[in-house]
């Protein structure tokens, strides 16, 4: 997602925060592979790792290590009109994001659920087996009050 965000940013800049070295190494390799020069990779855990980053216009949250409300509060302090997109598959994450939508009273919200199914061989048939649905939350124009 970070590479795609940087590519879409054009002359803008993207930042990726990651706490796992196993994710950061391939990210650096993909920056070189796709000639992405407008992506800063920051090792660490949010919100602490993003404290010194500039105010974002957009933010993608692919995980929060249990810090979702703190991360969103920091993003809103930096830019009250930041557009936040967050994904969730666990019920706890879905509940936390729903609570954030209420707590920060966003002016614009949308939740989309995407379901995926894969075929599997079962004798002469190929039934489709459902995978975990993915919930995509989009929020903008929140308030810290």
Descriptions of predicted regions:
Residues 11-16, 84:
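Short beta-strand element of Class I
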Residues 38, 67-68, 91:
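Cytosolic regulatory regions of ion transport systems
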Residues 73-130:
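C-terminal substrate-binding/active-site "lid" region of AdoMet-derived donor-dependent transferases
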Residues 123-145:
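Core SAM-dependent methyltransferase catalytic element
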């Amino acid at each position: 997602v970070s590479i795609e965000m940087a590519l879409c940013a054009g002359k803008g800049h993207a930042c990726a925060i990651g706490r796992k070295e196993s994710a950061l190494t391939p990210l650096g390799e993909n920056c070189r592979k796709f000639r992405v020069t407008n992506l800063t990779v920051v090792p660490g855990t949010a919100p602490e790792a993003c404290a010194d980053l500039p105010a974002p216009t957009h933010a993608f949250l692919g995980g929060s290590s249990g810090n979702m409300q703190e991360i969103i509060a920091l993003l809103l302090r930096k830019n009250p009109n930041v557009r936040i997109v967050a994904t969730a598959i666990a019920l706890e994450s879905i509940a936390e994001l729903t609570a954030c939508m209420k707590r920060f009273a966003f002016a614009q919200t949308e939740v989309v659920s995407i379901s995926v199914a894969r075929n599997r061989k079962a004798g002469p048939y190929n039934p489709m087996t459902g995978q975990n649905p993915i919930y995509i939350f989009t929020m903008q124009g929140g308030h810290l009050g």
